[in-house]
Amino acid sequence: REAAGKRNIGSLIENAVNELDSLDKMSRLERPSQYGNTVQERLFNVALELSITWMNRILFMKLLEAQLIKYHKGNTQYEFLNTDKIQSYDDLNSLFFKVLARKLEDRGVTTKEFFDRVPYLNSSLFEPTELEHTTLFVSNLGDSRLLPIYIATLLKDSNGKRRTGKMNPLQYMF
């Protein structure tokens, strides 16, 4: 973990650490010592476990999205991991639990219309974990935090030049 003055609050881990700490979620853990010896170790390790869970879901969805587009001969209407559909961590949380974890007929009207081409996945990956129930869901993360763009990024701006500065982590991922 970076030193206190060098941490990127826009990263999933640091965003989660901040929310875990400010909401005093560590006090809800049954055995906090399993996550480390100090408060800082525990905060980091819980945030790391949550971040890994969230990133595993995102990676799976990215692979699913690519397969759907390929199966439907490049039809971009099957894209669902983009900032047109996912503008906040609340939207991402909805995709996890109100879309992928529910059959089409069990989804709410708005969710059904917005994600009508996203299939139901009968997978435990899209069920809340015990740690999420006890601490944070991805929807608890702060949406306004920015992440510095990696200096050797392959991302380009509208002029074809390498992007610099900061951007929203969801835009960065999608």
Where are these regions (language model features)?
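Preference for the N-terminal adenyl/adenosyl cofactor-binding alpha/beta module
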Residues: 1-174
